[in-house]
Amino acid sequence: MVKIKVCGIRREEDIEIVNKYKPNYVGFVFAKSKRQVDMYKAEKLADKLDVSIKKVGVFVNEDIEKVKEVSFRVKLDIVQLHGDENEEYIDKLKGFKVWKAVNVTAGKDVEKFKNYRIDAFLVDGYDGTNRGGTGKSFNWNLLKENQDKILKPIIAAGGLNIDNVEKCIEVLNPFAVDVSSGVETDGFKDEEKIKKFIMRVRKFK
């Protein structure tokens, strides 16, 4: 079954919603973003999260010691790197589960995937400025053509919503799908959209 991550959790109301519908993962964004939370806020929210839901911390080119501090404080299950982090940086996170986000714009982007020693790749859209949470999708067919070269679980992100997530799964059959802006209304997580998104994903066995 395709797993689900709801990213950009930042309010107690968001925690109540995800506790009700139980995605597999939630994401706390520690990088500069309109969904950013600090370590202390994330810790309070995480304490109220259902124990069955895994916690992912999203970082962009953050100091490695800060990543470790936040991870221990919030009790993160996974570190998601959404910047220009290289192999040397990732090697310093030995002992942590790491997802590396990559923007797919050409075949060469896919080629470099296999050089990273991580647990999964999160493939996201790119709007030319922002890293993730942009509502922009990527070329699923380009990724599909190169999937056999990656040899790691793929998490599909970027512009997913209740209208296109089924097609994404049909094309890619990813390990997981990651949604943020696609389940928001006026910049806030929308319970009905989260419910429908999760229902549509979970119909795939």
Curated annotation (Swiss-Prot):
Its EC number is 5.3.1.24. Belongs to the TrpF family. It is an enzyme of class 5 (isomerase). Keywords: Amino-acid biosynthesis, Aromatic amino acid biosynthesis, Isomerase, Tryptophan biosynthesis. HAMAP family: PRAI. This is N-(5'-phosphoribosyl)anthranilate isomerase. InterPro entries: Aldolase_TIM (IPR013785), PRAI_dom (IPR001240), RibuloseP-bd_barrel (IPR011060), TrpF_fam (IPR044643). The keyword Amino-acid biosynthesis applies. Pathway: Amino-acid biosynthesis; L-tryptophan biosynthesis; L-tryptophan from chorismate: step 3/5. It catalyses: N-(5-phospho-beta-D-ribosyl)anthranilate = 1-(2-carboxyphenylamino)-1-deoxy-D-ribulose 5-phosphate. SUPFAM superfamilies: Ribulose-phoshate binding barrel. Pfam families: PRAI. The keyword Acetylation does not apply. The gene is trpF. One of its GO terms (biological process) is L-tryptophan biosynthetic process.
